[in-house]
């Protein structure tokens, strides 16, 4: 019975178990559908999120690109604006330069004036900016741009003559015996020569060449700054001729002398070159070159620098060049009468009377470089008593009138001055000049 009851019980429970299994299978299918739906919904959400992220990224990228474009446009605008400003500034600068170049000034403003009563014998030597020497028979004084005394040396001379090379100055008593050497810092040396001094030249390091007279004998000697004789050259005026002029190179190693004499009742001139280095030590009196010129006079000879020299003839100029033994390199022939010559270490000029029918001006000025190539020629009418070149400017003046040319040939300034002009010196500052008059030292600014 128990067994039968157990079987009946199991038989009754079996459909329940099957029903539960059927119910479990139904639940799993729904769950699967639910899971699939959830998965699809989740995927769609993920897709929407991804799309949103990509859209946001694209929007951010567009914003970055837009910002980059705006920055680039701003930079371009800045560049264009800067270029425009620079172009305007350049145009203004070029225009001012052209205006300044072509304009001729006829007016001046008096900047300052200082009295110099009783000082008419003083000569002014402009050495460099901020250093001017005042030389008279009683000594030499150096003043700065404010005219304050930097140093002074006293002496007594009857007729002081001056030669300048760079910032080295030789002051000698013409027809006397005293020689003083200065630079911008003060006295370098002084000594006495044994015969009557007629000419003196100085090199940068203080070496001095002097022409001395002793009856019918001329001595052309070279000294160091302390008076020690480097070369002693005795010449006979009757044989060699009279030394018209001489110069020493800036390095003190070469000397050029112009002689004039009469040979067979004919005027004879010659130019002698001396070398005091090892090149000329084995030559008689260190003479390394001699050139004769018949029928002409050579009143001036100059070293432009250590290698170039020029001989001013009465009918032109001859340019020499050579490191040790100068040779003739170029000859300039002037057909008209030479009125004046001027020079510095870089340029030399010749002024002649002008007789050209097509040009009615009275004078013709020609400027040349040290090698003889021409810089310019210009014509003018002003009567002048002094001419000199200083830096890149040429000064012509008389007692009441001043004219300034540039070395490019431009007339820069031409006007009368209210006082008598004794000397003109460049000053510090654009367009400023020192005008020395008999009773004042004036600083003017042209404009």
What is each PLM-predicted segment?
Residues 116-127, 155-167, 195-206, 239-248, ...:
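Repeated scaffold domains used in trafficking and secretory/extracellular systems
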Residues 81-97:
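Hydrophobic membrane-insertion alpha-helices, especially the h-region
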Residues 144-146, 183-186, 223-228, 276-279, ...:
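Short loop/turn segments that connect beta-strands within beta-propeller blades
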Residues 1-58:
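N-terminal targeting leaders characterized by basic, low-complexity, disordered sequences
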């Amino acid at each position: 019975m128990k067994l039968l009851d157990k079987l009946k019980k199991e038989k009754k429970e079996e459909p329940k178990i099957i029903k539960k299994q059927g119910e479990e299978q139904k639940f799993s299918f729904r769950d699967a559908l639910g899971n699939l739906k959830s998965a699809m919904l989740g995927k769609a959400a993920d897709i929407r999120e991804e799309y949103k992220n990509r859209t946001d990224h694209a929007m951010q990228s567009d914003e970055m690109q837009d910002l980059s474009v705006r920055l680039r446009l701003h930079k371009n605008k800045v560049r264009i604006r800067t270029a425009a400003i620079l172009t305007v500034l350049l145009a203004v600068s070029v225009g001012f330069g052209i205006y300044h170049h072509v304009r001729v000034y006829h007016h001046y403003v008096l900047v300052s004036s200082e009295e110099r009563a009783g000082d008419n014998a003083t000569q002014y030597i402009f050495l460099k900016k901020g250093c001017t020497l005042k030389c008279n028979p009683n000594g030499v004084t150096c003043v700065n741009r404010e005219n304050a005394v930097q140093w002074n040396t006293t002496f007594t001379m009857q007729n002081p003559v001056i030669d300048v090379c760079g910032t080295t100055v030789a002051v000698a008593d013409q027809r006397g015996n005293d020689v003083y050497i200065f630079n911008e810092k003060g006295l370098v040396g002084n000594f006495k020569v044994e015969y009557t001094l007629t000419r003196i030249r100085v090199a940068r390091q203080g070496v001095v060449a002097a022409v001395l007279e002793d009856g019918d004998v001329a001595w052309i000697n070279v000294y160091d700054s302390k008076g020690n004789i480097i070369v002693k050259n005795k010449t006979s005026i009757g044989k060699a001729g009279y030394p018209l002029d001489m110069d020493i190179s800036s390095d003190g190693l070469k000397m050029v002398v112009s002689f004039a004499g009469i040979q067979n009742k004919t005027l004879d001139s010659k130019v002698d070159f001396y070398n005091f280095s090892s090149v000329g030590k084995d030559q008689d009196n260190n003479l390394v070159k001699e050139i004769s010129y018949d029928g002409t006079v050579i009143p001036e000879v100059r070293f432009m620098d250590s290698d170039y020299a020029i001989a001013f003839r009465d009918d032109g100029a001859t340019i020499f060049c050579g490191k040790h033994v100068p040779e003739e390199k170029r000859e300039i022939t002037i057909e008209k009468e030479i009125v004046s010559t001027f020079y510095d270490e870089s340029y030399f000029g010749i002024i002649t009377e002008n007789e050209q029918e097509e040009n009615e001006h009275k004078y013709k000025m020609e400027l040349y470089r040290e090698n003889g190539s021409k810089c310019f020629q210009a014509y003018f009418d002003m009567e002048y008593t002094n001419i000199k070149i200083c830096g890149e400017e040429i000064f012509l003046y008389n007692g009441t009138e001043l004219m300034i040319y540039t070395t490019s040939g431009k007339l820069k300034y031409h006007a009368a001055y209210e006082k008598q002009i004794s000397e003109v010196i460049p000053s510090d500052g654009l367009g400023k000049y020192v005008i020395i008059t008999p009773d004042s030292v004036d600083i003017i600014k042209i404009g």
